[in-house]
Amino acid sequence: MTHEHHAAKTLGIGKAIAVLTSGGDAQGMNAAVRAVVRVGIYTGARVFFVHEGYQGLVDGGDNIREATWESVSMMLQLGGTVIGSARCKDFREREGRLRAAHNLVKRGITNLCVIGGDGSLTGADTFRSEWSDLLSDLQKSGKITAEEATKSSYLNIVGLVGSIDNDFCGTDMTIGTDSALHRIIEIVDAITTTAQSHQRTFVLEVMGRHCGYLALVTSLSCGADWVFIPECPPDDDWEEHLCRRLSETRNRGSRLNIIIVAEGAIDKNGKPITSEDIKNLVVKRLGYDTRVTVLGHVQRGGTPSAFDRILGSRMGVEAVMALLEGTPDTPACVVSLSGNQAVRLPLMECVQVTKDVTRAMDERRFDEALKLRGRSFMNNWEVYKLLAHVRPPKSKSGSHTVAVMNVGAPAAGMNAAVRSTVRIGLIQGNRMLVVHDGFEGLAKGQIEEAGWSYVGGWTGQGGSKLGTKRTLPKKSFEQISANITKFNIQGLVIIGGFEAYTGGLELMEGRKQYDELCIPFVVIPATVSNNVPGSDFSVGADTALNTICMTCDRIKQSAAGTKRRVFIIETMGGYCGYLATMAGLAAGADAAYIFEDPFTIRDLQVNVEHLVQKMKTTVKRGLVLRNEKCNENYTTDFIFNLYSEEGKGIFDSRKNVLGHMQQGGSPTPFDRNFATKMGAKAMNWMSGKIKESYRNGRIFANSPDSGCVLGMRKRALVFQPVTELKEQTDFEHRIPKEQWWLKLRPILKILAKYEIDLDTSEHAHLEHISRKRSGEANV
């Protein structure tokens, strides 16, 4: 750790930070405000709320109030922005900015954290560039003294992007996007059930005037027939194509059609395509019963998803650090997420690229607009086009046979992965088989061929429709080899948890004895525990996280009513503390006990003492998470008994074991989208590998790189040979030896008011957006 960073606790002494939310609200803004306030106070700085956005900055007075630790309590689970946001005309005029500068100087505030969309952030940059002129004007007119001017000689600005459209270039995800997707998907799922009853076509209009992100991801997450987005207008004969597509879907036996339209959708000539236009077209040409639903402001509402709370919190921490480390020479920056890395980017570069996209669309340079949106957006578009617009070939000549299976415990999103694997496989012209009940089913021959409609409507369904078991293959190699020959299986896609990975290792071992096992296979990590080596995320973990989070919210609410109550909640995850840690961040827990971060009786004592102190404040409730296997002796009951005894007369304790609800439920948008893209990526790899492994008329794959885990690493999806991942695995505890999320634990402790050192050595350095374009998360 570098020495200048070591003093995070004193970094803010003598400094003041103001935080404001501006422009359209977005879920997760409160999480960011809470983190800015608490981390600011932790560093020794004074933190001020600016109410009503820039308007409050201009009007001053009671709009700018000092924040306390407790004033941001219970904010985490609220949607919108608690400190208010307003569109502000005054700040656009220099006169307004002069008043704003005066209000800041008088309070000694030289650090401004702006949470909003690109308009709000551009405004902040203008304000910063004029700062010294504004000060000299104020000094000339006698509004501020020379001494005040010197004290506030420069203004630091850091932006956080809060916008449900995800329309800001340079950030993979803006605060609020994931929550907006949650709202949309809840509605799409509800509409799907009624559409199926009546065989209807639904046209859904989602927000996004200049950006089609929400529409695009929604269509991937619900398997829509068609999506209209501003960046990619349809071809000139789109009416023909759309109607043909809808009737094909119907003829395959589907009872519903879903068409997603972004509010800014246009055709190649820039003429708007409205949801009514589409409805009229379908009714006129096909005579289908068609309904339009415009989602509107529902998308901005509701509680933030777990992802947005963690994103808001992490960005808030990073923003405070960027402000306090700022000098007159550092450009105004935005803090954002790339893959799962926090990055700082020059604010104006991002604004420029964001404007370039709009200009490219205005000038009908649509290919360029798509490129500027970044690689992740383009990947979404490619997968959508494949799944929605390519017809599977009629003949299976020269095709290969690939089998898909689920292994391990059920996880939400497994079905979405199976669906995209099967459909992409069919589009490539392969024969696709599905295996029921994991390796056991492969041994018993529970295998059948899957056609296009076999997996219809699977994206939104939780659990595992194929059936899944933890059984490993080793003891049934004889039968498995026989079935590989019998069904002519030439490639295997294994979707599952830690057993899918260890099963893969066993298959590699078995190749020495059984030639039949020399076929390419790929493991797609799918488990709520997120403990598969070689991947930062696994399918199903996001859904489980949201389930835990929702439960914790309800429990906290009940505790807020009874007061002086501490809840101890046990989460799943085996030995892996991912769920407990991330849910702790997202639900605002006081502590999260996990196996990877060993704790002693002294730590438990410190936690109890901490809660005793907390009961003296206005926040009279506590939330403690415990991973199921964090310690064999300090069980949930033990911790509950300890807290009950030590808290006598000060607080009551209650315990909850969440259990299997964490494996159930409908998959979240993230898990649907992630699973869909992983399935597509796995099949593209598979068809290449099978062709490579063709020897004398049969498949023979014997190299280490023909058995891989497909994982998300930092910013890209990568294939890693299972044998190479052995070194990185702790087999006894079924977890990877290195886990990226452990470095988020200090944030959890600081936000819960513990005096600890924040290791800021892993800080994001300023990057440039052009470089980022090529290295972006390739998901």
From Swiss-Prot:
The active site is at 165 (proton acceptor). Keywords: Acetylation, Allosteric enzyme, ATP-binding, Cytoplasm, Glycolysis, Glycoprotein, Hydroxylation, Kinase, Magnesium, Metal-binding, Nucleotide-binding, Phosphoprotein, Transferase. Mg(2+) binds at residue 118. The modification Phosphoserine is found at residues 132, 376, 666, 774. Pathway: Carbohydrate degradation; glycolysis; D-glyceraldehyde 3-phosphate and glycerone phosphate from D-glucose: step 3/4. Residues 2-389 are annotated as: N-terminal catalytic PFK domain 1. Residues 401-779 are annotated as: C-terminal regulatory PFK domain 2. Catalyzes the phosphorylation of D-fructose 6-phosphate to fructose 1,6-bisphosphate by ATP, the first committing step of glycolysis. Belongs to the phosphofructokinase type A (PFKA) family. ATP-dependent PFK group I subfamily. Eukaryotic two domain clade 'E' sub-subfamily. Homo- and heterotetramers. Phosphofructokinase (PFK) enzyme functions as a tetramer composed of different combinations of 3 types of subunits, called PFKM (M), PFKL (L) and PFKP (P). The composition of the PFK tetramer differs according to the tissue type it is present in. The kinetic and regulatory properties of the tetrameric enzyme are dependent on the subunit composition, hence can vary across tissues. Interacts (via C-terminus) with HK1 (via N-terminal spermatogenic cell-specific region). This is ATP-dependent 6-phosphofructokinase, muscle type. The gene is PFKM.
